[in-house]
Amino acid sequence: MITCHFINWDKCLSHQIWPAITKGWPDTDKPVHFFWGLAGNNVKKIKEVSDKGEEWWFVDTGYFSMPIKRYPEPMILDKNKTYFRIVKGKLHTIRGKVGTGQRLNELENKGIDVNFKGWYTGDTKHILLCPSSPTVTYHINGISQEDWIKEVTSTLKQFTKREIRVRNKPRPDNQWWGTDIKDELKDCHCLVTNMSMAAIDAVMNMVPVICHTDNVVSPVASHDLKFIEKPLRPGRKTMNEWLKYVAENQFTLEEISNGTAYRVLQEQNI
């Protein structure tokens, strides 16, 4: 039995996504839950279904996609170029099979940047610290976002003398609103995060990453802050395989509705 947990706000994108899920996902006697983000009571509900041992899937914005408009209310600007990730039992995709490259090529043909450009080889300067939202940080790390920033900064200073800059997720009421992370990735030595998808921006703009092991970038990143001066920089073959793998884990509304998402995810034995 499929249960789609709606957010109690009629503008929430879940109201567009859940009809696609119920149409494209086979319904069985086994309980299967779908959650959109961690808003509302989703954190509590996810814990409840996990404690029962029931299957649950996390749905949120895609990894390589045309951005949605977020403010003043969320809006899909181009359904053909907007992708959503569907992840079993976690917030990010961290396991699965490397695809053939067909889905990756489709993204490229749509004008979505999926081209690995290598790594900076010249002098680098600062470290960019990009925390996840307060909700995700507490869910993953069990501490506030502020405490996470303090702890990580303190630990980094044991291993580097580089400038440490903090960049939060842009919101209308903060200093990063209207800014582009690419500007802060220039001359950046390494981006450090827990679960932020800023990690994707980094590796796609020649900057290595240190992140939580549950971050989608985890397979091509370092995980221990002691490696800050020499973070992992995988070769092109590894990065291209990672890109193919990630492309197998995000889907358009049409692909969710017509069963493509279910089929592709089942082929990966997730």
Tell me the role of every PLM-derived stretch.
Residues 9-12, 38-41, 62-65, 132-136, ...:
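Short, solvent-exposed loop/turn segments at secondary-structure junctions
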